[in-house]
Regions:
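Non-catalytic substrate-recognition and accessory regions of acyl/acetyltransferase enzymes
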Residues: 1-101, 116-128, 142-175
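Short, internal active-site loops enriched in acidic
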Residues: 131-138
Length: 175
């Protein structure tokens, strides 16, 4: 799976919602009530077309998740950070079509895509990744271990927030 910008025509929010509507209705869920609330932010951001801060996790055939990614300065960091938040996942994950293991794999793939962005097109040495819930932290707990092979000089999970810093030598290799 790859994290890609949401763009017309095949990765537009409209196209993704169409796919997710079919997914929800395939298990008898009323999409109009299922999507109320959580989809509103994306509807607003895409009202006038593509929005540069929106990304989707795709396997080439389907979109599994979407999130907002921003590169910004924060006072507690000396350089720009990458912030990923407002994660929405396909109804197949929320309605039990996919199992917990598949959900975990998708969330890890999404985080991996954010790390890739931080080393490539949206260069940043610090990442703030807002999980869907504190329960998702279990999928990332092993990354808190301080090992020589780790990409991270710091990796913390507080509630539903992952904060991590890439090792400087890792950043230099991508420059």
């Amino acid at each position: 799976m790859r994290l890609l910008p949401m763009k017309e025509p095949d990765r537009s929010w409209r196209s993704i919602k169409g796919q997710w509507k079919k997914d929800a209705e395939s298990v008898g869920e009323d999409f109009s009530t299922f999507s109320t609330g959580s989809f509103t932010a994306y509807d607003g951001l895409t009202k006038e077309g593509d929005h540069p801060s929106l990304y989707c996790l795709s396997d080439g055939e389907r979109v599994h998740a979407v999130c907002q990614v921003s590169r910004l300065m924060m006072s507690k960091f000396p350089s720009p950070i990458l912030r990923a938040r407002f994660i929405l996942v396909s109804p197949v994950y929320e309605l039990g079509v996919a199992d917990a293991g598949q959900y975990a794999q998708m969330m890890v793939a999404l985080f991996s895509g954010i790390v890739w962005l931080s080393r490539d097109t949206m260069t940043a040495s610090h990442i703030r990744f807002f999980l869907k819930s504190p329960g998702d932290a279990q999928f990332f707990a092993a990354l808190q271990a301080d090992t020589s092979m780790s990409l991270f000089s710091k990796f913390t999970i507080d509630g539903a927030l992952i904060e991590c810093s890439l090792k400087e030598d890792e950043m230099a290799e991508t420059a």
